[in-house]
Regions:
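Residue-level marker of positions within ordered structural domains that often coincide
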Residues: 1, 50, 155
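Class I SAM-dependent methyltransferase Rossmann-like catalytic core
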Residues: 2-35
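Compositionally biased regions
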Residues: 11-15, 115, 206
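A short linear-motif detector with a strong N-terminal bias
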Residues: 20-23, 33-38, 74, 104, ...
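A structural signal for well-ordered alpha-helical scaffolds and beta->alpha junctions
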Residues: 22-29, 42, 143-147, 197
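A general structural signal for short secondary-structure junctions and capping/turn motifs
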Residues: 34-35, 48, 192-195
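Conserved SAM-binding loop
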Residues: 36, 40-132, 204
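S-adenosyl-L-methionine-dependent methyltransferase catalytic module, highlighting the catalytic core
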Residues: 106-113, 123-208
Length: 208
């Protein structure tokens, strides 16, 4: 259902796989399109309360952002991101981004839906904790990701082209004496040593 229900505590929400609940400032999904621009909008998946300006913020019905209704910068849409289709037409979206969300998700569903809604040449940008790190091992994660997964998954490679990668050294790695960091370059350390890299950001273009 696509409705104009107000945000309410998650215990009162239907978590039917197709349920979509809009922020109370919208009467229907058309209002979301009007607010952000049909055919040129951007989506932030798993946005919580920190979605960037200009992005349609979407979060899970069971996520943290569904617990407190109508706070400032609340998501525009709550839905079951792991099962339901995104409420947007094919080839309609300029950019899909997520920050520390994919590791909590049913990854292939998210990737397939992101590919579907992105228009040709659209951008898919994501940040995830590096699997081989303390952040990557947090309880609640269901995906444990490094760049290796994205380079070796055939479906991802078919649908997306990796344009840029950035890796963030952990505080522990940066505390190593300079000569050790020269002996153990970061690229080697992030692959073979635990907790050398804590996060990666990858920017892709969609292949259509």
């Amino acid at each position: 259902m696509v409705g104009n229900e107000k945000f309410v505590a998650s215990s009162e929400m239907s978590i039917h796989s197709n349920a979509i609940i809009l922020n109370e400032k919208y009467k229907g999904i058309e209002d979301v399109y009007q607010a952000y621009g049909r055919g040129s909008f951007k989506i932030d998946l798993g946005c919580g309360y920190v979605k960037p300006p200009g992005f349609i913020g979407i979060d899970n019905l069971s996520g943290e952002a569904s617990q407190i209704p109508n706070v400032q910068n609340a998501p525009d849409i709550l839905m079951n991101l792991d099962e339901a289709a995104f409420p947007f037409p094919d080839n309609s979206c300029e950019e899909v981004r997520s920050s520390h969300f994919l590791e909590h998700s049913q990854l292939m569903h998210i990737l397939n839906e992101s590919y579907r809604v992105l228009r040709p040449g659209g951008t898919f940008l994501f940040a995830v904790p590096y699997a081989n790190s303390a952040e990557g091992m947090y309880p609640g994660h269901v995906q444990f990701l490094t760049e290796k997964w994205f380079y070796e998954n055939l479906t991802f490679q078919k649908n997306f082209k990796i344009e840029h990668e950035e890796y963030f050294p952990s505080a522990d790695y940066l505390k190593l004496p300079f000569f050790l960091r020269m002996l153990i370059p970061f690229k080697f350390a992030r692959t073979f040593l635990f907790n050398a890299c804590w996060q990666m950001i990858i920017r892709c273009s969609v292949k259509k």
